[in-house]
């Protein structure tokens, strides 16, 4: 009887640990400034772009992509004042992936990722989606949390579901 309970317990644990959260919504095309995520999902297409491409041809990027993702390797340059208007005038959501300082260093003039005060900006979030609507004089931000690095698939799924809904 103990052996049966042990075997059933092990099967239950194995079944739970293999639970992978995978985005299965509409196909999304995401422009990436920085490192392309290592994500294997046929519904998500990543394409590398530069900050200059994004700033010089915002209309083309907004028309051909569902979102722009900026990754940590580009945060310092991406937080330069010359890009603030680009983010605030973008017609598509911007994902600041793995930014503990949220979107503020990128959307506020006179502030860079390096100089932004971490203690005052850290709300515990891992990633922020930012969307500004100049015509409506409105900006929205959605925060995503990652408590366990093993749950990165779940984080991506939530981010992509939000992008799909916008």
Predicted regions and their residues:
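C-terminal motif of bacterial Sec signal peptides marking the signal peptidase cleavage site
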Residues: 12-15
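Short, well-ordered secondary-structure micro-motifs within conserved domains or adaptor modules
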Residues: 61-75
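Bacterial signal peptide processing site
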Residues: 17-20
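Positively charged n-region of N-terminal signal peptides that target proteins for export
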Residues: 1-4
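A short, well-structured beta->alpha microelement
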Residues: 33-63
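Extracytoplasmic electrostatic interaction patches
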Residues: 36-37, 82-166
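Active-site-adjacent loop/helix micro-motif of nuclease/hydrolase catalytic cores
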Residues: 42-43, 75-84
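Conserved beta-strand segments of the P-loop GTPase G domain that flank and frequently precede/overlap
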Residues: 32-33, 68-72, 95-98
């Amino acid at each position: 009887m103990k052996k049966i309970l042990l075997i059933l317990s092990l099967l239950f644990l194995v079944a739970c640990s293999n639970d992978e959260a995978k985005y299965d919504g509409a196909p999304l095309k995401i422009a990436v400034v920085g490192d392309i995520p290592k994500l294997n999902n046929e519904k998500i297409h990543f394409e590398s772009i530069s900050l200059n491409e994004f700033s010089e041809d915002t209309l083309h990027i907004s028309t051909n992509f569902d979102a722009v993702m900026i990754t940590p390797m580009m945060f310092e340059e991406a937080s330069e004042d010359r890009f603030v208007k680009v983010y605030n005038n973008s017609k598509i959501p911007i994902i600041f992936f793995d930014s503990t300082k949220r979107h503020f260093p990128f959307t506020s003039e006179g502030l860079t990722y390096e100089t932004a005060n971490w203690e005052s900006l850290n709300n515990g979030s891992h990633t922020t989606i930012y969307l500004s609507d100049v015509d409506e004089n409105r900006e929205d931000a959605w925060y995503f949390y990652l408590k366990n690095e093993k749950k990165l698939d779940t984080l991506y799924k939530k981010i992509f579901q939000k992008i799909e809904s916008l």
